[in-house]
Amino acid sequence: FPAMPLSSLFANAVLRAQHLHQLAADTYKEFERAYIPEGQRYSIQNAQAAFCFSETIPAPTGKDEAQQRSDVELLRFSLVLIQSWLGPLQFLSRVFTNSLVFGTSDRVYEKLKDLEEGIQALMRELEDGSPRAGQILKQTYDKFDTNLRSDDALLKNYGLLSCFKKDLHKAETYLRVMKCRRFVESSCAF
């Protein structure tokens, strides 16, 4: 992220977050279609809900709660969510070797790193200093399991993809709330 106006930094971060959230949703759907029998999907989704460690972060759970937090807090939460996936995503491409959506999985890590840098640039602008994000939580998700012949591995990966999708949705929401708060525009209704 080169030096640019704050409005551009926010616009770029929101676009990156939206793109990553869409990739995560597409990846989740493709994995589900390929590996999870239709009759099992709903019950598995309910069981997976409790396994996202990001639920332990005292972060807002929706747009209304996010609007009650400061921009710096929302940036910190977003950064923690993004950083918790950097490790696991390095293994994503090994799991999905012959798949169309997953053909982009090598780039997902780079896109996540770009978003991390964008959030850090926003934090520097808003905090007038270097980011201190590690103070909230320095936990990360397990890596994806490459053994797709094991039911346990399939369920683990399905749960991880579900958490990845949820976490990117949160980060996207936080960034959009901040952008709308600072730069009122027609695209603020979401």
UniProtKB/Swiss-Prot annotation:
Positions with a binding annotation for Zn(2+): 19, 172
Any one GO biological process: positive regulation of growth
InterPro entries: 4_helix_cytokine-like_core, Somatotropin, Somatotropin/Prolactin, Somatotropin_CS
Subcellular location: Secreted
Keyword Secreted attributed: yes
Disulfides per UniProt: 52-163, 180-188
Family the UniProt entry places it in: Belongs to the somatotropin/prolactin family.
Its job: Plays an important role in growth control. Its major role in stimulating body growth is to stimulate the liver and other tissues to secrete IGF1. It stimulates both the differentiation and proliferation of myoblasts. It also stimulates amino acid uptake and protein synthesis in muscle and other tissues.
PANTHER family for the chain: SOMATOTROPIN, SOMATOTROPIN,PROLACTIN
Name of the protein: Somatotropin
Organism: Vulpes vulpes (Red fox)
